[in-house]
Amino acid sequence: MSGTFLGFDFGTKSIGVAVGQRITATARPLPALKAQDGKPDWNVIEKLLKEWQPEAVIVGLPLNMDGTEQPLTARARNFANKIHGRFGVAIVLHDERLSTVEARAGLFEHGGYRALNKGSVDSASAVVILESYFEQSF
């Protein structure tokens, strides 16, 4: 097992991406992927999977604060299922509540408003999702 994981923060216009290592329980952002109504360029995802050869892909599951599902929840689950179906990689859905809030706060702390562009926030959210998964799983 490689100990490498990819994390995705699913969105309809942008999908945040992060790569992390189980041994250090840390992740770092990769460039966010553009999406059209939630549909990414699958060739780019294939390249990411070939480059990083992750043990599993962690996809953030957007839930309401009370734990109930919202309209985006089913779309994120569908995105995860498509990754598994197309590429055969193991998928884990991970609760992403407050990941965007935490990501925005961290980016603002390090770069003010200039750091809060959409792609940066989405990939920083993917980092939060992945590191949260590591904390809860290992």
UniProtKB/Swiss-Prot annotation:
Its EC number is 3.1.-.-. InterPro entries: RNaseH-like_sf (IPR012337), YqgF (IPR005227), YqgF/RNaseH-like_dom (IPR006641), YqgF/RNaseH-like_dom_sf (IPR037027). Gene3D superfamilies: YqgF/RNase H-like domain. One of its GO terms (molecular function) is nuclease activity. GO terms for cellular component: cytosol. Its main location: cytoplasm. It comes from the Bacteria. One of its GO terms (biological process) is rRNA 5'-end processing. SMART domains: YqgFc. Disulfide bonds: none annotated. It is found in: Cytoplasm. Keywords: Cytoplasm, Hydrolase, Nuclease, Ribosome biogenesis. Belongs to the YqgF nuclease family. Could be a nuclease involved in processing of the 5'-end of pre-16S rRNA. This is Putative pre-16S rRNA nuclease. It comes from Klebsiella pneumoniae (strain 342). The lineage of its organism: Bacteria, Pseudomonadati, Pseudomonadota, Gammaproteobacteria, Enterobacterales. The gene is yqgF.
